[in-house]
Amino acid sequence: MMTPQHILMVIRLASNPHAQLFWAWIALCLALALHVADEASTGFLSVYNPTVMALRKSRPWLPFPVFTFKVWLAGLVIAVVLLLCLSVFVWRGARWMRPIGYGFAVIMLANGLGHILGTIFGRTVASIRFPRPMPGFYSSPFLLLASAYLLCEL
């Protein structure tokens, strides 16, 4: 049964001018969570860590770290939780969230494209080849769609 509190909540949801941006933000956060699960279950670090090591040989100034599985997964889970916590500010229409939103969307767009291109080419750098599809490939379309959605709403 709908209580008056439920009705008021629905009215607030429908009348918020930032609701579309909020849902776009949530969609990208959930797409990222799905992507993390995809990468974790398909062995992403078996491609990422050797790629970083190969890049360090030719470009030692690149600051990419090598990860253990636990540290990598914990860091990404914390990042997803923090991004979801920021959704409160998106809901409220905080102007300072716009640049963060653009950065988040562009990085996730590049991430999704990177996994798709990695799958097409079967490698990250010349010396690092892997069986197709690249780990994280299956969730990449969700990253692309959610990134585009957020960019359109920004």
PLM segments and residue spans:
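Membrane-interfacial loop-to-transmembrane alpha-helix junctions, especially the N-terminal start
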Residues: L21-W25, W96-F104
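Aromatic-anchored segments of alpha-helical transmembrane domains
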Residues: L32-L34, V106-I116
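Core segments of transmembrane alpha-helices
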Residues: K70-S87, Y138-L144
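Juxtamembrane "helix-exit" motif on the non-cytosolic side of transmembrane helices
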Residues: V88-R92, G114-T124
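Non-cytosolic membrane-interface motifs at loop->transmembrane helix junctions
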Residues: I100, I120-S139
